């Protein structure tokens, strides 16, 4: 009998009979859930002795990580940011609600998961991993009012899958018979090379259709998929496999995460600006990069001469800068020209005169009707929002759509967010909006079909120019904020290595899944456009 037929039953028997032993074997197989991906030679010096000027293009998490790391090591750093604030997707800026009444707003709520190893280390190096609160529960709210809760589930890989069944997300008979039995194994088999070769040209919608997902499991998959700014028919199955490996099947931190209880500006960005100033780095806000040229000895950025460049803008900025850059080979430009952003995403912050019922964590994912993917109740945890509700009553909410349908106008998106919110919270019907801030952007990294092969790596192909951002192909699995921070460290390490300096340690979840390398079931061929299995 092939392994994929008997393995589920053997695993189930072992899990029931000797769970401590099985947990230990899983931890061993998954490298104790954490690996260091680079070697740090402690014999090498840490500080730069010769003058090196570095231009960091983009002040998001990736650029800030690289800039602060290099500035601390003695590089002369200049950071260029087109916005009037630092932070990128973690950025924050003030808006006026009324005369004498301002508020900080941002691109939206961010989660800080237990396996964000590099981001944690970066924040800890600044003394900023304080003032966080646990979300307590990870909730998906269905249109029928039913809730799928993940917070109390077992966190050990494989045990957490069984826990989903016990929580009613699926029934064992749904996944132990074909076709699901033969297809679900892909999520335990992550391997960067094989996974992307086999499944990068397969959409999650194709997988859903072939696997015949039960309704609640489909809901969990769909909401998770849209968090990567893509509808199911556009999202690469390989990228989804990587994200499931990263968040759920490679470590025992679970899906319960932390979040800061203060706005990102005082919590993160002001201290980061102070750290840059402490190490004599120059920051140019509201300064777009209008020209980049490679020269024999280095680079010219906006007319100024530099020895090295870190390209750390968002995906739209990176494509614009590199396709117009002088002295850059055409084959390098082609990689950047292939970059495209994901679908539009919308964030609507509203200050309203009615509150909503309690009993939910501050951030809740929703079963989308047409646009509403999640909402945040800021007045339940953020000091500034709490002060506003003390003065005015009501609530401060944020409504999210991660993948906006292409056929909707901005006004239609905004109205649909409000309408769908009331469907979930009818007690808010008839509310009045005192203030609102609506954002509709298209600048997030796309994880669409077939994009991985041409995705730029840290080494841009131009000597002295390195890339950082969540759009960069890394040699280890990472997603979202962790991918941005880790890529900043990898970019900085490349320049440190060039100068024979000690690198910064970079950690990752295990590089391969629990069942990676196992033979593929013949039925798996239905997922492979080229017949690979």
Residues covered by each model-derived region:
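Extreme N-terminal leader/targeting segments of oxidoreductases
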Residues: 2-54, 72-73, 511, 515-533
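Mid-domain catalytic core of redox enzymes
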Residues: 12-23, 27-34, 287-397, 402-408, ...
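N-terminal Rossmann-like FAD-binding beta1-loop-alpha1 element of flavoenzymes
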Residues: 49-79
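Glycine-rich FAD pyrophosphate-binding loop
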Residues: 71-96
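Conserved FAD-binding subdomain of flavin-dependent enzymes
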Residues: 98-134
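Helical element adjacent to the flavin cofactor pocket in flavoenzyme catalytic cores
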Residues: 243-299, 306-308, 312
């Amino acid at each position: 009998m092939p392994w994929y037929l008997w393995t589920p039953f053997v695993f189930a028997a072992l899990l029931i009979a000797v769970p401590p032993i099985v947990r230990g074997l899983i931890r061993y197989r998954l490298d104790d859930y954490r690996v260091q991906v680079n070697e740090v030679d402690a014999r090498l010096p840490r500080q730069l002795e010769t003058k090196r000027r570095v231009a960091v293009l983009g002040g998001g998490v990736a650029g800030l990580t690289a800039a602060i790391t290099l500035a601390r090591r003695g590089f002369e750093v200049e950071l260029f940011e087109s916005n009037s604030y630092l932070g990128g997707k973690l950025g924050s800026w003030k808006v006026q609600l009324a005369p004498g009444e301002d508020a900080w707003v941002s691109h939206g709520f961010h989660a800080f998961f237990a396996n964000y190893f590099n981001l944690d280390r970066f924040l800890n190096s600044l003394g900023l991993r304080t003032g966080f609160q646990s979300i307590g529960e990870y909730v998906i709210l269905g249109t029928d009012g039913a809730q799928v809760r993940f917070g109390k589930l077992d966190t050990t890989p494989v045990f957490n899958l069984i826990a989903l069944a016990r929580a009613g997300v699926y029934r064992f008979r749904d996944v132990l018979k074909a076709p699901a039995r033969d297809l679900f194994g892909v999520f335990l088999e992550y391997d960067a090379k094989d996974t992307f070769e086999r499944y990068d040209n397969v959409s999650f919608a194709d997988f859903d259709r072939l696997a015949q997902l039960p309704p609640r499991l489909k809901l969990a998959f769909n909401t998770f998929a849209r968090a990567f700014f893509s509808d199911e028919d556009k999202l690469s199955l390989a990228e989804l496999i990587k994200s499931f490996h990263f968040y759920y099947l490679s470590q025992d931190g679970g899906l319960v995460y932390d979040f800061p209880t203060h706005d990102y500006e005082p919590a993160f960005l002001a201290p980061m600006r102070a750290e840059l100033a402490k190490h004599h780095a120059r920051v140019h806000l509201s300064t777009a990069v209008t020209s980049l040229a490679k020269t024999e000895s280095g680079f010219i950025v906006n007319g100024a001469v530099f020895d090295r460049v870190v390209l750390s803008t968002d995906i739209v900025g990176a494509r614009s800068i590199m396709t117009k850059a002088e002295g850059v080979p055409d084959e390098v430009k082609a990689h950047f020209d292939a970059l495209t952003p994901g679908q539009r995403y919308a964030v609507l912050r509203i200050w309203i005169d009615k509150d909503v019922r309690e009993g939910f964590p501050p951030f809740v994912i929703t079963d989308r009707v047409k646009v509403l993917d999640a909402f945040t109740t800021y007045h339940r945890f953020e000091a500034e929002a709490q002060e506003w509700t003390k003065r005015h009553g009501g609530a401060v909410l944020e409504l999210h759509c991660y993948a906006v349908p292409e056929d909707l106008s901005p006004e239609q998106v905004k109205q649909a967010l409000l309408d769908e919110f009331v469907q979930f919270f009818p007690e808010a019907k008839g509310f009045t909006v005192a203030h609102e801030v609506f954002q509709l952007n298209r600048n997030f990294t796309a994880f669409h079909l077939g994009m991985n092969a041409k995705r730029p790596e840290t080494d841009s192909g131009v000597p002295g120019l390195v890339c950082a951002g969540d759009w960069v192909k890394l040699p280890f699995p990472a997603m979202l904020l962790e991918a941005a921070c880790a890529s900043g460290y990898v970019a900085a390490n490349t320049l440190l290595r060039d100068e024979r300096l000690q690198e910064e340690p970079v950690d990752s979840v295990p590089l391969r899944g629990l069942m990676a390398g196992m033979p593929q079931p013949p039925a798996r061929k239905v997922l492979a456009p080229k017949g690979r299995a």
